């Protein structure tokens, strides 16, 4: 009997290995992207949001003192949950996520509107999966030759400085988001998931994934956890919250 821990990609691989090895498994969702659709929350997400929020807090003072636009690039392979949540919590003026189309002109319009109110600095948070305005994916080539998501913050900065007199600085958090001490809520969630997973094994209920829904732990078929993907939806209450706070979130909101 095995407990497997990971995101949708890890679960797909481990489920296949378990089938080939004739192992009985129970899965626990752990991904900072929070994109496993069958659960409202995954282990690691709240910690990543907390790290990104602290980064925005730290960038606020230097942005104000030097009258700059500080751009923070955060993880989010396909979904913008980290950027959206941290952006609201950390007081970002602009939040860019892959689910909502943006334009450089839209960003400039927002910055100009702020200047009219004598606000000469700004905080921009962008998920790594956000594409260029022309729809091309931004990839960073590493020393091992692999190309991975990364660099959209630099692209946004370049475009803004090319078209305006705004001075930009870019910070990419990278794996700092994955290595921070877990928040209390993540520790509690992990404990609840672990206890429930062991109980499933005890009851010989296999090929199940534990999930968090309506403030309690439930279990669903592993295939459901793998198959369903959770993006930020336009009707998401946090999208409405961001818009009500006058945060720029794209041109079609």
Model-identified regions with their sequence ranges:
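Acidic/polar active-site rim loop that often engages polyanionic ligands
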Residues: 28-41, 64-65, 89-90
């Amino acid at each position: 009997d095995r407990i497997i821990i990971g995101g949708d990609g890890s679960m797909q691989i481990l489920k296949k290995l378990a089938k080939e090895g004739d192992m009985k498994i129970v899965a626990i969702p752990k991904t900072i992207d929070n994109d496993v659709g069958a659960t409202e929350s995954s282990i690691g997400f709240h910690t990543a949001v907390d790290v990104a929020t602290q980064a925005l807090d730290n960038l606020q003072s230097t942005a104000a003192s030097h009258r700059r636009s500080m751009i923070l690039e955060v993880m989010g392979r396909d979904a913008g949950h980290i950027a959206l949540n941290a952006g609201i919590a950390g007081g970002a003026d602009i939040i860019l996520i892959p689910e909502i189309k943006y334009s450089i002109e839209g960003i400039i319009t927002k910055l100009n509107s702020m200047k009219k109110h004598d606000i000469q600095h700004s905080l921009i948070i962008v998920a790594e999966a956000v594409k260029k305005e022309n729809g091309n994916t931004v990839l960073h080539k590493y020393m091992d030759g692999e190309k991975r998501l990364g660099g959209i913050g630099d692209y946004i900065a370049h475009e803004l400085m090319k078209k305006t007199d705004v001075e930009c600085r870019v910070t990419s958090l990278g794996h700092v988001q994955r290595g921070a001490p877990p928040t209390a809520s993540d520790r509690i969630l992990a404990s609840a998931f672990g206890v429930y997973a062991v109980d499933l094994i005890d009851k010989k209920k296999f090929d199940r994934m534990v999930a968090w829904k309506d403030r309690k732990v439930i279990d669903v078929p592993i295939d459901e956890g793998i198959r369903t993907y959770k993006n930020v939806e336009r009707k998401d209450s946090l999208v409405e919250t961001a818009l009500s706070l006058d945060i720029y979130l794209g041109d079609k909101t």
